[in-house]
């Protein structure tokens, strides 16, 4: 896959939460492969080790090493700056964001991707589980955005724009069985995105979200392994999406990169579906 703007993020800096695997890692690699300096924030970043707050590993600022391929398969580890933080821990989030801003000299793009799943009906989970999921999926975005906004404002003042991209879900726009808590959290992200876009549009900070369908990520793989028949469950998830397959992490990353790009300068308050047609298509059954 090629891009008409291979260096569209040159000179820009980005922070990707939940960046150690799946959609977050694919996004970080793609942004770096197109010229950005990228920090990944996660609770654990195995490739770099370390357990404390702030910067971990051997990231060399300004010394990015790119691999081949559109999604940087690399970039190599050295091109991504790891910062360790739990998005439910406000002091840790503030410290991690400050570390990235200090290392890069600013911040142009925030990708709020960190999140966890939940299964069951409205009766299935107790109050503690509801609080836990909302704390990560919704309040986590609030914490990282709040910590990053001063740097994003400075970037917008200097360059004319900055960007926040949130990861919502098709669960925010379509009713899925056994996903009440997860859907509530992702629906909140959808609404949060619109409200943030309205609040910050006059500061030239664009706020958008992606709404992925079921993606082929390590998290989904773990869910499948817990199913009584993992192969049958995978086929059911594929069949639920009109294109007949799972969404790839790289496809979601490409959508995030578009929304974060300076070339999307007039795009704000938008939810971009990457769901194989799941939210919008109503197909007839295939001929027997």
Task: Name each model feature, range by range.
Residues 123, 174-180, 202-203, 244, ...:
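Active-site loop immediately N-terminal to the catalytic Tyr-X3-Lys motif
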């Amino acid at each position: 896959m090629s891009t008409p703007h291979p260096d569209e993020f040159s000179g820009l800096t980005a922070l990707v939460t939940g960046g150690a695997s799946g959609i977050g890692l694919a996004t970080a690699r793609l942004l770096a492969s197109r010229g950005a300096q990228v920090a990944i924030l996660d609770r654990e970043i195995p490739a770099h080790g370390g357990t404390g707050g702030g910067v971990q590993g051997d990231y060399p600022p300004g010394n990015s090493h790119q691999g081949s391929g559109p999604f940087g398969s690399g970039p190599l580890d050295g091109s991504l700056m790891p910062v360790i933080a739990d998005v439910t821990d406000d002091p840790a989030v503030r410290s991690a964001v400050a570390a990235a801003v200090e290392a890069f000299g600013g911040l142009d793009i925030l990708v709020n991707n960190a999140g966890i799943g939940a299964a069951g009906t409205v009766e299935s989970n107790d109050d503690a589980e509801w609080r836990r999921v909302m704390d990560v999926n919704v309040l986590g975005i609030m914490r990282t955005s709040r910590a990053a906004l001063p740097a994003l404002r400075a970037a917008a003042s200097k360059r004319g724009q900055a960007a926040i991209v949130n990861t919502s879900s098709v669960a925010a726009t379509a009713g899925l069985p056994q996903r009440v808590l997860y859907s509530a959290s992702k629906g909140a992200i959808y609404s949060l995105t619109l409200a943030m876009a309205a609040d910050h549009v006059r500061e030239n900070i664009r706020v958008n979200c992606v709404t992925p369908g079921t993606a082929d990520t390590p998290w989904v793989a773990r869910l499948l392994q817990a199913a009584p028949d993992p192969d049958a469950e995978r086929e059911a998830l594929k069949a639920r999406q009109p294109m007949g397959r799972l969404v790839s992490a790289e496809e979601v990353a490409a959508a995030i990169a578009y929304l974060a790009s300076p070339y999307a300068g007039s795009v704000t308050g938008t939810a971009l579906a990457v769901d194989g047609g799941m939210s919008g298509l109503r197909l007839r059954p295939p001929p027997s």
